[in-house]
Amino acid sequence: SSEAQVPVLRVPRGQGIIGAAIESGDIIFVPNVHADERHFKDAEPITGITTTSLIAVPLITQAVQLGQELGSAQPQIIGGLEAINRVDGYFTTEDADLLQTLAKQAATVFQIAKLYGDANELFLDTIQAMVASIDAKDPYTNGHSQRVSEFSVAIGKQMKLSPEIIHQLRIGALLHDIGKIGIPDTILSKPGHLTEDEINTMKQHPAIGANIMQNVRLLRNEIPALAEHHEHIDGTGYPNHLTGDQISLFGSIVAVSDVFDALTSDRPYRAALDVEEVLNKMQKDSGSHFDDACVQALIKAYLAGEIKTQKDRAA
């Protein structure tokens, strides 16, 4: 029936007739599997299906590695496809042609999935490298971007955001301070309070970050996290003095995560504040500086053990 489930069967690498097809790269016809010593006999008790005959073909695709020169793709066997128990007689060359066609389509799908995974991993690694370069410029906030990203994800989960949105939020939060790459090192690494001019220079980093990333099409949904994480509900934030609903959800979430991490982390001019004190302060500022729903989600995430401060991690 349409609801029938096929048991999961794992054949050890190199075993079975399908293993022989994968290792050799050849199409294998077997009219009587029980007369073939390569037959994987443990399959039938698991599947409940008695195999009499079969045909096995390798899944062959072009191995493409990101970062390699064009033209470097080489044929690669990534698996195998097997058909069993032809109803009327033995398997034919026509059956082999059909199975090879199906195998090529399956191999293409698998290869696309792998390339997507590789590209996504490369993309995330590149972002991590960019963030690490910012942390290297500002030693007093080492690990800040990673923590803000993790806090933002925890808030997003408490707010029941979809996995796709949370993935975008994770990246946007990770990149929220990327604009500091345009701020002089003398300001970033200054061990003490900044002058008014230095503060005004530092306030440019959200706009700098948004400008850097605005032409990266893959990041267009994440840019509000970069541009708006210092905006306040009452319009007293920067750089654009946005108010209320003018501030995006990403901007609101990252604003809460950013301040929570800043206040619960050590700085050269003060020690980390107590978490309870910080949460009370942020609750008082809800509706003026912070979006109340985001603050409540932060509190729930912290009480659920989903958020670890800098001090927690060092313990």
Which residue ranges define each predicted feature?
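Metal-dependent catalytic cores of enzymes that make or break cyclic nucleotides
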Residues: 4-8, 25, 48, 65-72, ...
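Soluble sensory domains of the PAS superfamily and closely related sensory modules
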Residues: 20-28, 34-37
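Interdomain signal-transducing alpha-helices
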Residues: 21, 25, 54, 83, ...
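Short amphipathic alpha-helical signal-transduction/dimerization elements
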Residues: 22, 34, 88, 100-111, ...
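Regulatory loop-to-helix N-cap segments in sensory/regulatory domains
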Residues: 40-41, 61-80, 84-102, 194-195, ...
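Signal-transducing coupling segments at domain and membrane junctions
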Residues: 2-9, 14, 31-57, 61-73, ...
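Heptad-repeat alpha-helical coiled-coil signal-transmission segments
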Residues: 106, 112, 119, 123-126
